[in-house]
Amino acid sequence: MSAFPPPPIPAPDASRVARVEPTPDVVRGILELGDRARADDGVAPFNEQTRLLLGTEDGPALLVVQGTDGRPIGAAVAARGDGGIEAEIVVDPARRRRGVGRALLDAVLAEAAGSPVSVWAHGDHPGARALAAATGLDRARELLQLRASVAEARTGLGERPMPAGLALSSFTADDADDWVALNARAFASHPEQGRMTRGDLDDRVAEPWFDPALLLLARDADGRLAGFHWLKVEGGQAEVYVLGVDPDRAARGLGSALLAAGLDLLAARGLDEVDLYVEADNAPALALYRRAAFRDAAVDVQYRRA
């Protein structure tokens, strides 16, 4: 071991942030950077939609700070939508507290050119809170990650039969348009989920983790879709991916019945633990999940500047 300390790493400034094209090598480098951050922080810096859009035509802007070895030490993924810019930022754990995050956030603000900016901080990292405060971004939204034992969650729900007149089936390609329509109704006020298109659904169906048997549909006697429970199992980890109910059938026990049916599927497959994500201000959904013994595991925070 050397008796001499390593030389200090020069603090980058905004001039070192480069807007890069989404070549396969660039996308790979950003994803590997995200993996390093996830291993250190315990949470992924990019959400699923960002990962799906990376490298696509007309995808998000990619802003990168390169290290001396050519690998990115920081990156921002900034997507422009109707409400302005929405971004996610990641910094290599070994290069934090050296100005990389501030340089990237300044570059995102410049990219926005005065339009509203939203930045997600997955895991509510203290560094992200400090950076938001220093740049005038307000805490605008919280997304809770909840976790439960499959057995405890199922016990907590108790007997939850499907409401009369409804029957369960598994997803097929013929169900796609009905699912998109009901998802839009069930999540009409949700800024991301409610905007899912048929193309977005097709992208997820094409993912290696997708299993049609884990997308449960509840239909009435006339074939109308009343609700659904979509489960995701990847790498041995189960997730309540999305659970939706027709607003006309809200508060009638369908959500509880769908959750119970999904948990039964997970138990039959020998899965012990399940996660889910829910908006912190969604009181009805939180009440259901608390009854099912879900507990807080992490929180994602969206900071915003109007």
Curated annotation (Swiss-Prot):
Monomer. InterPro entries: Acyl_CoA_acyltransferase (IPR016181), GNAT_dom (IPR000182), MshD_Acetyltransferase (IPR050276), Mycothiol_AcTrfase (IPR017813). Acetyl-CoA 1 binds at residues 89-91. Catalyzes the transfer of acetyl from acetyl-CoA to desacetylmycothiol (Cys-GlcN-Ins) to form mycothiol. It holds the Pfam family Acetyltransf_1. The gene is mshD. This is Mycothiol acetyltransferase. Acetyl-CoA 2 binds at residues 243-245, 250-256. Keywords: Acyltransferase, Repeat, Transferase. 1D-myo-inositol 2-(L-cysteinylamino)-2-deoxy-alpha-D-glucopyranoside binds at residues 48, 192, 232, 239, 277. It comes from the Bacteria. Residues 17-163, 166-306 form the N-acetyltransferase domain. It is an enzyme of class 2 (transferase). Its EC number is 2.3.1.189.
